[in-house]
A protein has these predicted regions:
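Acidic/histidine-rich catalytic neighborhood of metal-dependent amide-processing enzymes
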Residues: 1-47
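Stable alpha-helical elements in mature extracytoplasmic
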Residues: 1-8, 48-52, 76, 124-127
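Sec-exported extracytoplasmic/periplasmic mature domains
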Residues: 10-14, 54-57, 61, 82-85, ...
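Hydrophobic anchor at the start of a short beta-strand
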Residues: 20, 63, 88-89
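Short C-terminal domain-edge/linker segments immediately following a structured domain
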Residues: 23, 52-58, 120-127
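Short amphipathic alpha-helical segments, especially helix-boundary/capping motifs
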Residues: 25-30, 51-55, 101-106
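Active-site-adjacent mobile loop/cap segments within catalytic or ligand-binding domains
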Residues: 33-38, 46, 67-136
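Acidic, glycine-rich loop-and-strand cores that form catalytic or ligand-binding grooves
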Residues: 43-65
Length: 136
């Protein structure tokens, strides 16, 4: 899992690369997707995570960005933090009602553009752009 982020974490594109924080967008376009506090993000990038959820609330997207704890996911953000010490937030739709924790189309042939929701992408995109734009 996460071979690209593990490689980049060990061998960054610029020697000694650092960033204030990172944002991982994973499965952020699904219909009726909601985004809870991911456990590893909360543990290692809590300040950045709070900025994101606060911006979503400010923009009127609190129905997408739920201020409650969600699951823990081993994903690229873990290795960005582990190898580069860059706090990284995973914005991910984690479905507690699913056997896998993810959308039923996850890793199937049905994981296609027909299952992407423009409103969800807009909520996530505008939130992330707001956070980036407001960084000093």
């Amino acid at each position: 899992w996460c071979l690209g982020s593990q490689y980049w974490g060990r061998i960054p594109h610029v020697p000694d690369y650092k960033a204030r924080f990172g944002i991982l967008l994973d499965m952020v376009g699904g219909k009726n997707a909601t985004f809870y506090y991911e456990a590893f993000s909360k543990q290692t990038a809590n300040n950045a995570m709070k900025k994101i959820w606060k911006m979503a609330d400010h923009l009127g997207y609190s129905n997408y960005f739920i201020k409650e704890d969600g699951g823990q996911v081993t994903d690229d953000h873990v290795y960005v933090n582990q190898y580069r010490q860059i706090p990284c937030v995973d914005i991910i739709h984690y479905d507690t009602q699913s056997n896998t924790g993810f959308n039923p189309t996850w890793h199937t042939l049905d994981d296609s553009l027909e299952n992407i929701d423009k409103a969800t992408l807009q909520a996530v995109g505008q939130t992330v752009m707001g956070v980036i734009y407001n960084e000093k």
